[in-house]
Curated annotation (Swiss-Prot):
Bias type Polar residues, positions: 92-102
TM ranges: none
Taxonomic source organism: Caenorhabditis elegans
Name of the protein: Uncharacterized protein C45G9.9
Biased composition (Pro residues): 118-136
């Protein structure tokens, strides 16, 4: 049999609707996770955790077993005290014989304590005789009474008295005088302390004055104007620090001294021609030096 193949029928496709401003695409609302959590948690915030905790606890409690009591150490038998020897029975007669000497010894001691030796009666002095006083212990030396060396005049007293002189020999100093306590340190109000304070004060003031003087001198006479000079005096060379204002006087004194020495040498060597020539050379050199300076 021959079958005729018919062409496929075209599917009827509905025309696509054109989008307009009025039409809006509708999407399914997304379920939030919070709602599902809220549905699960029926017992507050940590309900799910509480369920897990319960299951864990139930498992642990099932595993637990009752603890066995610790083994007790075996009790040791108490140590027996060493047995004392049984007291021997002593008959009553023997006990009485043992106690007798002890009692007799006690009685003898009491008797010795009670025996008192009678003292002889003190002699009563007769009524007419006075008892002698006990001897007094005299001191090492008697202190001297303070007395004035000048005689009292008749103006003060009715009669004049003789002058009291010091004893010729003084007693030796005793060892007690060495250990006498010294005077305590004076207070601030004592004159000695005040004198010391004033002395220190004045010494400080003097030192301040000296410092002020040194400052004034350093201002009036600066150090760069000082220089050392030397001159001859009594056939000795003298060196001094001299201020520049006094230089002409020092130079003049040096010149006078040198001229004097030269004249003395010339007078001494007038007879010797060679020495005189040497002296003239020295004088010429000195004149050249002085002419160059001035």
């Amino acid at each position: 049999m021959t079958t005729a193949i018919t062409p496929d029928k075209k599917k009827l496709v509905s025309p696509k609707p054109t989008k307009t401003t009025s039409d809006k695409s509708k999407t399914k609302p997304r379920r939030s996770s919070k709602t599902s959590k809220k549905r699960k948690s029926k017992k507050g915030l940590f309900g799910c955790c509480a369920k897990k905790r319960k299951t864990k606890r139930s498992k642990k409690s099932a595993k637990r077993t009752k603890r066995s009591a610790p083994k007790k150490a075996p009790k040791k038998a108490p140590m027996k005290a060493p047995s004392k020897p049984a007291a021997k029975l002593v008959p009553q007669q023997a006990q009485a014989s043992l106690q007798k000497p002890i009692q007799s010894g006690i009685v003898d001691a009491d008797a010795t304590v009670k025996t008192v030796v009678p003292r002889p009666p003190t002699p009563i002095p007769p009524t007419g005789v006075k008892p002698e006083p006990a001897p007094r212990s005299e001191p090492l030396y008697q202190p001297r009474s303070v007395s004035s060396t000048t005689p009292r005049t008749s103006a003060t007293t009715g009669t004049t008295e003789q002058m009291v002189t010091a004893p010729a020999t003084l007693p030796p100093p005793s060892a007690e005088s060495k250990h006498l306590p010294q005077d305590p340190p004076g207070d601030a109000s004592s004159p000695r302390v005040q004198r010391q304070y004033t002395a220190e004060k004045y010494s400080k003031e003097d030192q301040d004055d000296d410092d002020q003087k040194d400052l004034r001198k350093s201002v009036a006479y600066p150090s760069h104007k000082f220089f050392m000079t030397q001159y001859v005096k009594d056939e000795c060379r003298v060196r001094r620090w001299v201020y520049e204002d006094s230089v002409p006087l020092m130079m003049e004194s040096n010149m006078k001294h040198m001229l004097r020495m030269a004249s003395n040498r010339i007078a001494a060597c007038q007879s010797d021609k060679a020495r005189r020539c040497d002296m003239m050379k020295d004088l010429n050199e000195m004149t050249e030096i002085l002419d160059g300076n001035f």
